[in-house]
Amino acid sequence: PLPTWKIFMIQFLNIAGLGPIFGAIMGAKFGSASYLWIVFGSIFAGAVHDYFAGMLSLRNGGESLPEIIGRYLGVTTKQVMRGFTVVLMILVGAVFVAGPAGLLASLTPETLDTTFWIVVVFVYYVLATLLPVDKIIGKIYPLFAIALLFMAVGILVMLYVNHPALPEVWDGLRNTNPDASALPIFPIMFVSIACGAISGFHATQSPLMARCMTSERHGRPVFYGAMITEGIVALIWAAAATYFFHENGMEETNAAVIVDAITKNWLGTVGGVLAVLGVIAAPITSGDTAFRSARLIVADFLGMEQKSMRRRLYICVPMFLAAIGLLLY
């Protein structure tokens, strides 16, 4: 068991990938419809989804997603979901190795290139997947969460200080994307914002925290509250991106460039570094828990206890070899 505040921080980082930042920025190109989807989507869809996923796991002894599905939909569906979820988790983990490594390489000297950071991030993933939650994740996640929240609060404060001109919700309720004919609001905007409003990936992460909880009373602040917090972060970045597009046009398609420009102009050098650390922390903390989820799902499937390091390695070695193969490919 972990303290509730720490469980909240870990859950928040587990579910907050690049969606509430990069996704919200790209979603802002579609106009103020992105604001409405982030608000209503996170409240009535994303948070409800995460809460149900977490509470179902909590009431069934911390079972992982495929086991819960099998309990209610039968053995065949469970077997399909086991395979699908493990493959999905390995793919997510592999994607969230290359992305953060590229961001770190852009902040460090040329000698520390992307390949170097890929190795560093991957070694961290191996350790975070193998060791118990309280050994690494429980210690560093709160620091990552503080960096991510500092970034969001800092941008929010500067929105009020700079008081940029933003379109009224109803005036901007049209597709403002430069390529609107090829990129309709539905479904492209929803896919772009992704976990800034709702994500099925979260259903694989909530059971991890359900195993660390001691009371159902903690379910609402942890599962529901973490998604609402993610929605707030997404809304802040959507507003900041709207200002950026208003001042600089919509030609820029690299969300990382937009993040860098906004944070350096509004938060200064030190604030910009902390903000970028928050951006890097978001995918890293989703990647390591993706691998961890895959390990626990396979362990449930094989009925293999995970107290000994040797048994963890039986599962992790093939899984990480598959991820390395994807990265090399």
Across the structure, where does each feature detected by a protein language model lie?
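Helix-loop-helix junctions that connect adjacent transmembrane segments
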Residues: 142-145, 151-203
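Hydrophobic alpha-helical segments and their helix-loop junctions in multi-pass secondary transporters
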Residues: 93-119, 125-129, 148-176
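Membrane-water interface regions at transmembrane-helix termini and the short interhelical loops
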Residues: 29, 56, 67, 96-108, ...
